[in-house]
Amino acid sequence: MRLRSSFIALALTLLAAACGGSNSGGSDLPLNTGPAPWPNPDKVADRIDAAGLPSSSTESLTVHYHSHVDIFVNGKSEPVASSIGREDQSLFSPLHTHATSGLIHIEAPEEQDFTVEMLFTEWGMRLTNDCIGGYCSPDTDLTAYVDGTRYTQPISTIVLGKGEEIAIVIGSPPATIPSSWDCLANIDPAIENPAQCADFGQQVPA
């Protein structure tokens, strides 16, 4: 019986390793596997830590840029939660949101790659090669695009680049896959001046 139990444990370990390309909330941090719209995360500090990122009481602007994430469920745009990687104004990850527009703030003390996997781990959302939240293949197709070009690697590995538009599409796609984003249309409470659009890798509208 003990040998059989050991064999089962080993098999489960190997199976988990084979299911790469996914985020993990940790054993005490369950991931949201429900339908959209998805809420703000709980246990914010713990989820920042699970993403392998530091937290601080202030925002660091040594490295400062922005990306934009759209999520479409059967052609409908769904909001990105407004407090990912952030707890009020008292706790910040270098990777966070301030509104539901999909604008992703990268404000870090030093250069590093920030990925979609980190974002979804902070959010507490399931993301694998086949599933996002409560939607999974083969029932629902899951694809991603970066600046309008289909991304063929695991979605979790997408690096959030300066000014980039990332679209994650679940089920039937929207009429148009966005290849860019409008800075002025995505101004949120953390943006005080439209001239900051230049900081996002975009031209300031005339």
Predicted regions and their residues:
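Flanking scaffold residues of small Cys/His-coordinated metal-binding clusters
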Residues: 11
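Ubiquitin-like/PB1-type beta-grasp interaction modules and other compact soluble beta-rich domains
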Residues: 20-206
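Bacterial N-terminal signal peptides that target proteins for export
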Residues: 1-8
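C-terminal motif of bacterial Sec signal peptides marking the signal peptidase cleavage site
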Residues: 15-18
